[in-house]
Structure formats: C-alpha cells, structure tokens
Curated annotation (Swiss-Prot):
Gene: pyrI
Protein name: Aspartate carbamoyltransferase regulatory chain
InterPro entries in the cross-refs: Asp_carbamoyltransf_reg_N (IPR020545), Asp_carbamoylTrfase_reg (IPR002801), Asp_carbamoyltrfase_reg_C (IPR020542), Asp_carbatrfase_reg_C_sf (IPR036792), Asp_carbatrfase_reg_N_sf (IPR036793)
Entry note: cofactor: Binds 1 zinc ion per subunit.
Keyword ATP-binding recorded: no
Cofactor field: Zn(2+)
Assembly and oligomerization: Contains catalytic and regulatory chains.
PANTHER family per UniProt: ASPARTATE CARBAMOYLTRANSFERASE REGULATORY CHAIN (PTHR35805:SF1)
Biological process, per Gene Ontology: 'de novo' pyrimidine nucleobase biosynthetic process; pyrimidine nucleotide biosynthetic process
Similarity comment text for this entry: Belongs to the PyrI family.
Keywords: Metal-binding, Pyrimidine biosynthesis, Zinc
C-alpha cells in the first residue's frame, strides 16, 4: 500500500499555487517579489511527485492574495497552474491561471529602440503568438520574445 503524506503543511488563510512546472517555483517567487525579508509564511515544494505532471512545484503563501498582473505573469511561466484561495484552512475559490490575449503594461520590450522604452508615455503591449512554447510580439515594434526574454 502506498503511503500518502502531506509534505507541506496546510495554511489557514492565503494562496496556494499548484501545478507549477518542476523547477519554476523560484521564478514564480521572483514574479511575486517574495524574497528573504517577507513577514508572512511561504512554503515551497519543488520537484514534488504528481499524478498529472510526473513532477511539479507548489507554493503556499500565508495571508497574501494575488492581483491580476501577478496572475498574468505567472501564466507566462506556468500556464497550467492552479490557484486556490484558502480561508480558515478550506478552499474558498479555485481556478486555473489564464494567459490573456494581450499583455499591457506588465513586461518590457527587449528592443531598446521600441517606442515603449523611450520617454514617450506609451505602455508596452504584447500579443500572444504562441502559448507552447511561449512567444509574444510587441504591437509597436513587432519584436518577438520567448519566455527567457521575458524573465531575463
């Protein structure tokens, strides 16, 4: 008989990010601005066995919710991630992240000559060219960027 144990303890209130591709938890923590000086509990499970993905990463963040920009950024690196909102140790809401058709004002264009990188008041705007592998295109200069370009 297979033994089942909970490797990361439950949280009372906060957010669980599950089904992160194995090895990408640190990138998600970076997206969320979570560093070593936080004043809330953050639990990270990396390379956790998964029936759906073989291996996955999981992040539990006590007393913290995520905004739309953070969810959009997570969808770029973990397009199949599941978000669970926890209240009093119970899941109050559960949903998958969703890559929007356009990303406006949340990432920078890598083209230094793009109008969005000058002193003009223009927000960067990207269209999704491909989801797997991730390819984005700047609507202003047409520069394409992959996942590595976005997170460098």
């Amino acid at each position: 008989m297979e033994e089942k144990t909970l490797k990361i303890s439950k949280i009372k209130d906060g957010t669980v990010i599950d089904h992160i591709p194995s090895g990408k938890a640190l990138r998600v923590l970076s997206i969320l601005g979570i560093r070593d000086d936080v004043d809330y509990t953050v639990s990270v499970g990396m390379h956790v066995p998964s029936s759906k993905m073989e291996y996955k990463d999981v992040i539990k963040i006590e007393n913290r919710s995520l905004d739309k920009n953070e969810l959009d950024m997570i969808s770029l690196t973990a397009p199949n991630a599941t978000i669970s909102i926890i209240k009093n140790y119970e899941i109050s809401e559960k949903f998958k992240v969703e890559l929007p058709p356009k990303l406006i004002g949340i990432i920078k264009c890598k083209n230094q000559n793009c109008i969005t990188n000058t002193r003009e008041p223009v927000k960067p705007e990207f269209e999704i060219v491909s989801r797997h592998p991730l390819v984005l295109r700047c609507v202003y200069c047409q520069r394409t960027m992959n996942e590595r370009d976005v997170f460098e």
